[in-house]
Regions:
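Polar-ligand-bearing catalytic/cofactor-coordination segments
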Residues: 1-210
Length: 210
């Protein structure tokens, strides 16, 4: 239920911020900056910070609910740290996107949307390329899979399934959750298969490969 409520709630907050004049207030503060990119950054910061504060109760409730069901093992300080990291990463990406959009609108008022659409593909590919080596390690510790026999089996199975990956990693998710998971991430040389240590600790090789 909370998963389906989160997005409509966020859009409701955007609507309230817009109709109450809070957005104009942020715009007025940001317009005082000499450089446009700094103005964009200030506007995005205040908007993101306000959303962070308003969404915090719902996010905290989801965290406590997960703890009460024994799914999450994460301490509050660690959970809060992850949320702060989320904030700054989202802020940085948003500033970049907004700045590029404003520049495109200024340079081509009639076709800016077409150029923006054309940039979404390379930008998405870039994010997919850097995520396993830049973004993900900020949250957790990744290391090459220690069980080389299992790694060989996984790579053989991946080859049969046409999954282009030559690397298998494990990540210390047991510090945060009891859930099991494995996934493929990245593209090109950064493509990799990742197994949570909870999966490695609780399942046999045959169960993992299944």
């Amino acid at each position: 239920f909370l998963f389906f409520v989160a997005t409509p709630f966020e859009w409701l907050l955007y609507f309230i911020i817009l109709i109450t004049g809070v957005s104009r207030l942020f715009e007025r503060w940001s317009s005082e900056q000499k450089w446009p990119i700094l103005g964009n950054a200030m506007y995005v910061f205040w908007l993101s910070f306000l959303l962070f504060i308003l969404q915090f109760p719902l996010n905290y409730y989801k965290y406590t609910l997960s703890k009460s069901y024994g799914i999450s093992t994460q301490h509050f300080s660690s959970w809060l740290k992850d949320n702060v990291i989320d904030f700054w990463i989202s802020f940085g990406i948003s500033v970049l996107i907004v700045s590029v959009l404003y520049w495109l609108i200024k340079k081509s008022p009639k076709r800016w949307w077409l150029y923006a659409w054309a940039l979404t593909v390379p930008f998405s590919i870039f994010l997919m390329f850097i995520q396993p080596v830049v973004i993900d390690p900020i949250y957790n510790d990744f290391s090459p899979l220690k069980d080389k026999a299992l790694e060989t089996k996984i790579l053989s199975l991946a080859d049969l399934a046409d999954i282009p990956s030559e690397h298998v990693y494990e990540v210390n998710m047991s510090e945060k959750t009891n859930a099991l998971n494995a996934y493929v991430t990245g593209i090109g040389d950064n493509s990799r298969i990742v197994l949570w240590d909870t999966t490695l600790n609780r399942l046999s090789d045959d169960e993992i490969l299944f």
